Each structure stands twice: as C-alpha cells, then as structure tokens.
C-alpha cells in the first residue's frame, strides 16, 4: 500500500510501484515479463532469454552498466578517507532512511534497470521486493522507491539473479 499522503489525490502515482505486485493483479500465469513502454525489443530471442533467465526462482534483469551508460556513481574526496558519495542507489537509500550500512552496500553496486525483468510466479523475489518496497516507501518518494527496493533485494537480500546482457 502506498501511504495516502504520498498520493494526495493522484491515484496514478500508485502505478509507479505496481510492478512488485504483478502476480496479485494477474494470478493465472507461471512467469512474468515486464517491459516498459519505452523499451525496445529488437529480436524475439530476447523475450525467450528473459523467460529462461527467471527459471528456478531467479530474477532475470539487466544492470544499468555498459558502453551506452554514463558513469552512474561519483566520489568527491574531501580529505583523507572522508568523501562525498554520489550515486543513484546511495541517494535514494539515504532519502528512504533504510540505514547507513545498507546505503553503503548499495552505493557502488551496479544499478539495476527495472524497465525490463522476469520472475516466476512463486519466486521468493516477489516477497523480498514487496518487503523492501514497503520500507522504501515509508520515507522515500514514490519515484525511485521501486527501483531501490529491487536493488536491495539483489544486493542486500542476495536474491538469486541472472544478469542479462545489454544487447
């Protein structure tokens, strides 16, 4: 559930966190493949690859990492061992108040792109993702909470994941 004060009459915002509940909305499927409307499927083999990747409860997903992406994290060294960390995961983790140890663990982990992913119906990934999403929504904004939650599932909860290539 999205806290009411975060929605404030804008029910469409709930769609920003709906992916973690696909089996609830569409219960009659064994495997789920999410593809954002702005993603490009160039070859049907990609769809088959995602379905294969999620076998045995694994999460099939791609990291936001590679030649087409700019550097996603930066460190500004102040002096000695003191530094300011700037990364998407770290920023959202601090804002969501998930704890400094978790935020540090996520700081330089390759960001996961939730625009395309696959999971089986009974994968433990759904429960992990939903639990983390509930935590991130308490203090974080709706935008970014779902992505942070899946990054937590992979890098903190150690959800079994099959990372797929960018192309």
Regions found by a protein language model. Name each.
Residues 1-167:
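Glycosyltransferase catalytic domains, chiefly GT-A lineage
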């Amino acid at each position: 559930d999205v806290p009411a004060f975060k929605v404030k009459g804008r029910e469409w915002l709930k769609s920003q966190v709906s992916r973690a509940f696909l089996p609830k909305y569409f219960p009659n499927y064994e495997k789920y493949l999410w593809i954002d409307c702005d993603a490009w499927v160039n070859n049907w083999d990609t769809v088959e690859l995602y379905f294969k990747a999620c076998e045995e409860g694994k999460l099939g997903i791609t990291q936001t990492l590679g030649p087409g992406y700019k550097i996603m994290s930066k460190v500004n060294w102040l002096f000695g061992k003191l530094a300011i960390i700037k990364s998407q995961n770290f920023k959202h983790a601090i804002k969501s108040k998930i704890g400094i140890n978790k935020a540090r663990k996520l700081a330089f982990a390759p960001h996961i792109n939730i625009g395309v992913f696959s999971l089986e119906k009974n994968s433990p990934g759904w429960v992990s993702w939903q639990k983390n999403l509930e935590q991130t929504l308490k203090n974080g904004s709706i935008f970014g909470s779902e992505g942070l939650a899946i990054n937590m599932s992979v890098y903190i909860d150690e959800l079994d994941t099959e990372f797929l290539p960018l192309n």
